[in-house]
UniProtKB/Swiss-Prot annotation:
May bind 1 zinc ion per subunit. Transmembrane segments: none annotated. The lineage of its organism: Bacteria, Pseudomonadati, Pseudomonadota, Gammaproteobacteria, Cardiobacteriales. One of its GO terms (molecular function) is protein-exporting ATPase activity. The gene is secA. Zn(2+) binds at C891, C893, C902, C903. GO terms for biological process: intracellular protein transmembrane transport; protein import; protein targeting; protein transport by the Sec complex. Its main location: membrane. This is Protein translocase subunit SecA. Belongs to the SecA family. ATP binds at Q87, G105, E106, G107, K108, T109, D521. Monomer and homodimer. Part of the essential Sec protein translocation apparatus which comprises SecA, SecYEG and auxiliary proteins SecDF-YajC and YidC. Keywords: ATP-binding, Cell inner membrane, Cell membrane, Cytoplasm, Membrane, Metal-binding, Nucleotide-binding, Protein transport, Translocase, Translocation, Transport, Zinc.
Length: 906
């Protein structure tokens, strides 16, 4: 109540921000006449003037009014477009590192040019992030003309480019690209083996287009560069054959009530249960016993073994994936099968996600289910989430048509404030109340009837669905009624530009899966620009005028019919996606309308609002084809959407809390790699590593606080020989001859022995060769051990929830154990680097191509959206034969302990 009173007196925070920025708009407008008076060369010279002023101590805010005025005038000359006042406000919001919410058709692409130009003046680079390659090419190409006119360079990053092309694009003042390519290139940059292999510069400033799609919808999708891993395809096939024998648990609501009233234990009636909200599967006690029996029959486990024994965890993992594949992931909803491949469908945009694969064996399980070729499982070499990648930019901002519903999440996770920018013209779209049906069959009949009504008055219709399955079902119904229409979904994405360009034609019916992120406005009367482009450069003015006249007639006809009518065939889980669909109509003050159709057996209502609502309507006598327009029911449906949004927000925040732990470790590792790569040589670093290893050897085997009888001298000698190739008779040569030899003296002699090996190799092969080998070995070892650490962290994260059974906080336990693992990793990196360099030999002096060893550091292959193996420019180093001891074998020192608990503990 108090907040409302304050808002009435002083205006909301959003209104105050707009009012404050409007003062700067007046300054920019006052400069317009002086900019018009400048010729092209003088306008271009302003860029150099601004850069000079910045070097002399002025800030970007100081030059903002004049810089924005320059961009506005340049856009008029190059693009034929003039920034509106509200677009200037949007540009300032982006420059301030905030999110600008601008309605569809308000010119977000043009708004970005203001903040892009201003921030590019610093010379530190600006990244403009789009949702697909098409938009990156389109915007980078068209707006690149504007930036070039003003003396700035523009680069475009798309998948499939070679390293040199990407390096050039990143060194441009402004770089356009997709969110995934920027993220993958960050990982590739930090997997480089030499400075000239790096792609990116410092992450300075990014403007994210469709920011809600990338930072919220994609937040739980990790970017992973992976290499091949071992996989047992036959195991998946055998487990897949078991699925039909397992029954899904169906709960009896009456039994549930009796259990609650009588405090009785609920009787389980199936082998497994599913949770459609979280897409997870759980085994019942009955199912556990049944599955073990089936596994014994298949010969997958022994007679008396349990599914939960450590060695069978892999079986359980694969079986879980098979059950999820059959019962929670559906063809033409979650994925499509095309050209013998299972392709994921983005639930928010309806696009296929080329190159993306589900993890945890799920993708392989779906491939088995669909009978297509099973592709190899992968092992993570490097990964990062979008959340942590974009938070690394010094300044981040974004644009979207629908951010206000997620404003709290943007503020809480990314520290980004959302500012709603006023529209240039008032919105004329009419949003009708939802039409609510008992069953989907009645809903679809009503949708077809409304489409036919619109067609009769030649009003274009955009019919939005949440899945390919629904889009094809409605398409079949319209075909039976003889209604011509276009379908835009993941299966027809090749015709996307053509379908969207024609969606505003009189009487045009377009069915589309989620239109979020399509990036192209639906123009009433069709796309005039597309028609003029078809004429080509040789077209006469008369031909252009004829096309313009024909378009104007169609445009007026559509406006007379009521503009674009949007029909939502179902409510999406997120209100934001519904708003994006609505926003396709009524652009730039055009007329339009929207209406959603909801059935009480739609997935959203059924899963999150329960059967209570449907039961109540049936008792009131509502039939399948009856329809109601009830604000109460609509509020309940919105309540269900809020539940889903809250659930998804919690999931994203939970993921971030865990990923933050890995992110801090990632920063340390990548910084260490960067220091090694940039150093002329790492002799000092290697000296410190040898000293650290000797200290650990002493502490472990001959600790100063223990009497000599408790020292493990044999273990020390074995570790020196097996790990580092040092044959030192500590007992016979040192301690037997010098009984009073101190621990400090032993430490000095051991360090001298390590340094002697390095000196010997430098004398033999030369400093240059050993300096190169030191850097190369260090980078390879870091990459190899980091890869294993990522796998261990992933397993820890999957299992850590079990700590809650012991009344422990899983998050704290994860933080504690991951820290211990990381300390072990850093120690092991030092050990392996020194160990390998002690054993390294070269067949010929100063011939880097002839280095040999016994354990080659594996070459990193990168695969996700592409399988672009980054081959090292230097030859792989292999290691000389040294004695090998298995981790679980008895330690050769004779202690009687396992090697991993003795000499291998280092």
């Amino acid at each position: 109540m108090l907040g409302k009173i304050i808002a009435k007196l002083f205006g909301s925070r959003n209104e105050r921000i707009i009012k404050q920025l409007s003062k700067t708009v007046k300054k920019i407008n006052a400069l317009e006449e002086s900019m018009i008076a400048l010729d092209d060369a003088a306008l271009r010279a302003k860029t150099d003037e601004f850069r000079k002023r910045l070097t002399e101590g002025e800030t970007l805010d100081d030059v903002l009014p004049e810089a924005f005025a320059v961009v506005r005038e340049a856009a008029k000359r190059v693009l034929g477009l003039r920034h509106y006042d509200v677009q200037l406000i949007g540009g300032m919001v982006l420059h301030q590192g905030k999110i600008a919410e601008m309605r569809t058709g308000e010119g977000k692409t043009l708004v970005a040019t203001l903040a892009v130009y201003l921030n590019a003046l610093s010379g530190e680079g600006v990244h403009v992030v789009t949702v697909n390659d098409y938009l990156a090419k389109r915007d980078g190409g068209e707006l690149g003309k504007l930036y070039s006119f003003l003396g700035l360079t523009t680069g475009i990053i798309v998948s499939g480019m070679d390293t040199e092309e990407k390096k050039a694009a990143y060194r441009a003042d402004i770089t356009y690209g997709t969110n995934s390519e920027f993220g993958f290139d960050y990982l590739r940059t930090n997997m480089a083996l030499s400075p000239d292999q790096r792609l990116q510069r410092k992450l300075n400033f990014a403007i994210v287009d469709e920011v809600d799609s990338i930072l919220i919808d994609e937040a739980r999708t990790p970017l992973i560069i992976s290499g091949p891993a071992e996989m047992n395809t036959e195991l998946y096939r055998k487990l897949n054959e078991l699925v039909p024998y397992l029954t899904l648990q169906k709960k009896d609501p009456n039994q549930e009530k009796r259990s609650l009233l009588n405090d009785e234990e609920e009787i389980e009636t199936g082998d497994f249960s599913i949770d459609e909200k979280t897409k997870q599967v759980g085994l019942t006690e009955m199912g556990h016993a049944h599955i073990e029996k089936l596994l014994v029959e298949k010969g997958l486990i022994a007679e008396n073994e349990s599914l939960y024994e450590p060695k069978n965890i892999g079986l359980f993992h694969h079986l879980n994936a098979c059950l999820r594949a059959h019962h929670l992931y559906h063809r033409d909803v979650d994925y499509i099968v095309k050209d013998g491949q299972v392709m994921i469908v983005d639930e928010f945009t309806g696009r296929t996600l080329a190159g993306r694969r589900w993890s945890d064996g799920l993708h392989q399980a779906i491939e088995i289910k669909e009978g297509v070729t099973v592709q190899q499982e992968s092992q993570t070499l490097a990964s990062i989430t979008y959340q942590n990648f974009f938070r690394m930019y010094e300044k981040l901002s974004g644009m979207t048509g629908t951010a206000d519903t997620e404003a709290y999440e943007f503020q809480d996770i990314y520290n980004l404030e959302t500012v709603v920018i006023p529209t240039n013209r008032p919105i004329a779209r009419i949003d009708y109340t939802d039409m609510i049906f008992l069953k989907q069959s009645g809903k679809y009949q009503a949708i077809v009837a409304e489409v036919k009504e619109c067609l009769a008055r030649r009003q274009p219709v955009l019919l939005g669905t949440a899945s390919i399955e629904t889009s094809e079902l409605i398409s079949d119904l319209l075909t039976k009624e003889g209604v011509a229409h276009n379908v835009l979904n993941a299966k027809q994405h090749a015709r996307e530009a053509e379908i969207v360009a024609n969606a505003g034609l009189p009487g045009q019916i377009t069915i589309a899966t989620n239109m979020a992120g399509r990036g192209t406005d639906i123009v009433l009367g069709g796309s005039l620009k597309a028609e003029l482009d078809k004429l080509g450069a040789d077209a006469t003015e008369e031909e252009k005028a004829a096309v313009q006249e024909a378009w104007q007639k169609r445009h007026d006809e559509v406006i007379a019919a009521g503009g674009l009518h949007v029909i939502g065939a179902e409510r999406h889980e997120s209100r934001r996606i519904d708003n994006q669909l609505r926003g396709r109509s009524g652009r730039q003050g055009d007329p339009g309308s929207s209406r959603f159709y909801v059935a009480l057996d739609d997935n959203l209502v059924r899963i999150f609002a329960g059967d209570r609502m449907a039961g109540m309507m049936e008792r009131l006598g509502m039939g399948e084809n009856d329809v109601i327009e009830s604000k109460m029911v609509s509020r309940q449906i919105e309540g269900a959407q809020r539940k889903v949004e809250a659930h998804n927000f919690d999931a994203r925040k939970h993921l971030l809390e865990y990923d933050d732990v890995a992110n801090e470790q990632r920063k340390v590792i990548y910084n260490q790699r960067s220091v090694i790569m940039d150093a002329e040589n790492i002799r000092e670093m290697l000296d410190e590593m040898r000293e650290s290893i000797v200290t650990r050897l002493i502490t472990h085997y001959v600790p100063a606080d223990q009497v000599r009888q408790n020292w493990e001298v044999a273990g020390l000698e074995a570790a020196l020989l097996n790990e580092f190739g040092l044959s030192i008779a500590v007992e016979k040569e040192w301690l037997a001859k010098e009984p009073d030899l101190s621990v400090d003296e032993i430490q000095k002699r051991l360090l001298a022995a390590f340094n002697a090996i390095d000196a010997q190799k430098r004398a033999q092969y030369g400093d240059d060769m050993m300096d190169w080998a030191g850097k190369y070995v260090a980078l390879q070892i870091i990459d190899e051990l980091w890869k294993g650490h990522l796998a261990t962290m992933d397993m820890l994260r999957q299992a850590i929830w079990l700590r809650s059974r012991a009344q422990k906080d899983p998050k704290r336990e994860y933080q504690r154990e991951s820290y211990e693992l990381f300390i072990d990793l850093l120690a092991n990196i030092q050990l392996q680097i020194v160990r390998l360099l002690n054993h390294i030999t070269f067949n010929a002096p100063n011939a880097e191509s002839t280095a040999t060893a016994a354990e080659p550091a594996p070459e990193a292959s990168q695969s996700q959206s592409t399988n672009d193996a980054t081959a090292s420019q230097n030859p792989p180093i292999t290691e000389v034969e040294a004695s090998k001891v298995g981790r679980n074998q008895p330690c050769p020192c004779g202690s009687g302990k396992k090697y991993k608990h003795c000499c291998g503990k280092l």
